[in-house]
Amino acid sequence: MYDEPAVAGRESDPVGGGKPRATPPIGVDLTNEQALACAFRTLAHGGFSENMAGHITWADRDDGSLLINPWGLWWEEVSASDVCRVDADGVVIEGKWDVTPAYHIHTELHRRRPDARVVVHNHPYYVTLLAAVGVLPMIAHQTGSLYDDDLSLVSEYDGEVGDAELGRDLAVRIGECNNVILASHGIITTADTIELAVYRAASIDRFCRLAYDILLLGRDPLPIEKSIRVAMQKALVERAAGVYWAGAVRKLLRTDPDVLH
């Protein structure tokens, strides 16, 4: 069962720059399958997906199995009942559909990175645009601090990750980074929670679009000091990811209530 973070009651003293104590909840209890379906549709509605491409896996148990989307459904279509479960080798053990042939991207990365409970992969437009020319976006806005020292480029494109050996090789090149642009391909984003994974993924394309527009201007962005980037990254992870997720799911349930079915 997906456990929504506890919401404490409001106290009389002001927050004063700290973490808010009372924030609006999702308002419904979600199973893990429902939460993952909400992740697919939220990211799709935000322009993160490319038609039927892309996959998200969630190691929601400690038995090596993964929740994953079925092959052939667009992210906008995924409902909770469509979500599949595969074992550590990508064999479907629950669900009515087959899964992506590129599941080795996920299985091998999960093996190498126990902290990466959620792995998101797709080809959002502006990420892919910069990936096509092998350029990492510069941090030119405070939200870009989310990726400070946590964004890298795998500069060689080896085609489809169609077997475990290629998956292991990619996992080695990804290393400990949580946000990796794959040259001529797309993005892999990881996190230890579904909330943070979706927030990182949902924010990356705007980050890349801003960098692209700055390149078009032909001007260098104003520098943001390292100490400020570090503080902003901490604040975004601790204070923004959870409330982004709750708000995104609330909005989704108003427009796409069938996502829970």
In which residue ranges do the predicted regions lie?
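Glycine-rich flexible loops
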Residues: 2-261
